From Swiss-Prot:
Highest taxon of the lineage: Eukaryota
Record-linked InterPro entries: RGI1, RGI1_sf
Location in the cell: Cell membrane
Protein task: Involved in the control of energetic metabolism and significantly contribute to cell fitness, especially under respiratory growth conditions.
Identification of the protein by name: Respiratory growth induced protein 1
GO CC field: plasma membrane
Length: 169
């Protein structure tokens, strides 16, 4: 398969939740980023929910691009793995999301981290506007104690206009 063919193939499944919400689930990070770029062009960028589950690039690099050779210690219990994952998220994933949306000034100021025995979760939230449409971007990144796979949940919601209270004169 040529490089051109790989770029054209978007690996995605659409899953419907019990509430009727449709979530797009991607098999790799490149397909996810390609989809975000396409949604920005298609005017559907302010109401998107998708997920991607992938091995971080630094993990694949250490295993020479072979998922079978990934060390069992590459998980949320390993401080080095968690540190590298956080750097990957801050310096690459969030930056790629900004670029895909076409909003380089997007700042994820509302951040939180939750850590327990089973997983580590980072949550990022940021309000933004594209083509005069305001919306909130929510990104949740989760790593688990039993695998090097990372789960990313990406959600955008239109901002509700402020309800103005009517004053009675």
């Amino acid at each position: 398969m040529t490089k051109k063919d790989k770029k054209q193939k978007v690996k995605v499944k659409t899953v419907e939740t019990k509430e009727g919400e449709k979530i797009r689930v991607f098999e790799d990070l490149d397909s996810f980023e390609t989809y975000l770029r396409g949604e920005t062009e298609d005017e559907e960028f302010d109401h998107v929910h998708c997920q991607v589950r992938y091995y971080p690039p630094f993990v694949l690099h250490e295993s020479h691009q072979d998922p079978e050779k990934i060390k069992e210690s590459a998980n949320s219990h390993n401080k080095k793995f968690v540190r590298h994952l956080h750097q990957h998220v801050e310096k690459h994933l969030l930056k790629d999301i900004k670029d895909s949306l076409g909003v380089p000034e997007l700042k994820f100021k509302d951040k939180s981290k939750e850590e327990n025995f089973n997983h580590v979760v980072w949550r990022y939230h940021a309000p933004t506007a594209v083509r005069d449409r305001e919306f909130l971007v929510h990104v949740t990144v989760e790593c688990h104690n039993d695998t090097a796979m990372v789960d990313v949940d990406y959600l955008t919601e239109p901002m509700q206009p402020a309800v103005q209270s009517e004053q009675v004169a």
